[in-house]
């Protein structure tokens, strides 16, 4: 009974329907353009691959590096801190100051495989998680060199872009929660 009393065709004549379609299309386009800056990819800085070369990681690579870091490293390095030794962190100045410097992807990969003290004098193979002690640190067992590069890239990009990354307990980490 209602369908006979109300005719959609009569209410919206073809010209009105076209106008409605154009209006909806304009609203959808305007809505989409308004959201474009919100969903735009962040600017990812290049980081050092080696002392003489640089590399820029993709969002997908950084996402995988973050996942691997959170699985294998974040137990002791939450937010770039170093809980066993809070005087040395993963902030760029600390990575640059190590001997040898750990301020590039390949140097961090080498450190993960063969950790040494900050001054480079003593081996930490028996103490620091590494790819050789896989029975003690099973989370490192299946990491490939490519995985290690993604972890290193994630660390270096965070050190360059995240306020408070690698800060000590006395420094503010109020902005870090968005990045973890």
Curated annotation (Swiss-Prot):
Residues 1-40 form the signal peptide. It is a peripheral membrane protein. It is found in: Cellular thylakoid membrane. Heme c binds at residues 73, 76-77, 128. Keywords: Electron transport, Heme, Iron, Membrane, Metal-binding, Photosynthesis, Photosystem II, Signal, Thylakoid, Transport. SUPFAM superfamilies: Cytochrome c. Its main location: membrane. GO terms for biological process: photosynthesis, light reaction. GO terms for cellular component: photosystem II; plasma membrane-derived thylakoid membrane. Binds 1 heme c group covalently per subunit. Pfam families: Cytochrom_C550. GO terms for molecular function: electron transfer activity; heme binding; metal ion binding. Its cofactor is heme c. HAMAP family: PSII_Cyt550. One of the extrinsic, lumenal subunits of photosystem II (PSII). PSII is a light-driven water plastoquinone oxidoreductase, using light energy to abstract electrons from H(2)O, generating a proton gradient subsequently used for ATP formation. The extrinsic proteins stabilize the structure of photosystem II oxygen-evolving complex (OEC), the ion environment of oxygen evolution and protect the OEC against heat-induced inactivation. Low-potential cytochrome c that plays a role in the OEC of PSII. PSII is composed of 1 copy each of membrane proteins PsbA, PsbB, PsbC, PsbD, PsbE, PsbF, PsbH, PsbI, PsbJ, PsbK, PsbL, PsbM, PsbT, PsbX, PsbY, PsbZ, Psb30/Ycf12, peripheral proteins PsbO, CyanoQ (PsbQ), PsbU, PsbV and a large number of cofactors. It forms dimeric complexes. Belongs to the cytochrome c family. PsbV subfamily. This is Photosystem II extrinsic protein V.
């Amino acid at each position: 009974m209602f369908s006979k009393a109300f005719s959609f065709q009569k209410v919206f004549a073809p010209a009105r329907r076209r106008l409605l379609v154009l209006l909806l299309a304009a609203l959808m386009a305007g809505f989409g353009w308004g959201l474009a800056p919100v969903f735009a990819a962040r600017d990812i800085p290049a980081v050092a691959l080696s002392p003489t070369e640089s590399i820029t990681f993709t969002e997908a690579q950084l996402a995988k590096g973050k996942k691997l870091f959170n699985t294998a490293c974040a137990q002791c390095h939450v937010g770039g801190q170093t809980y066993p030794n809070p005087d040395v962190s993963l902030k760029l100045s600390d990575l640059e100051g190590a001997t040898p410097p750990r301020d590039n992807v390949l140097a961090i990969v080498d450190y993960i495989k063969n950790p040494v003290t900050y001054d480079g004098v003593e081996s930490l193979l028996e103490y620091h998680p590494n790819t050789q002690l896989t029975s003690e640190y099973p989370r490192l067992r299946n990491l490939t060199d490519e995985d290690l590069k993604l972890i290193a890239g994630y660390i270096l990009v965070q050190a360059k872009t995240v306020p408070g990354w690698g800060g000590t307990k006395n420094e503010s980490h109020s902005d870090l929660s968005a990045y973890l």
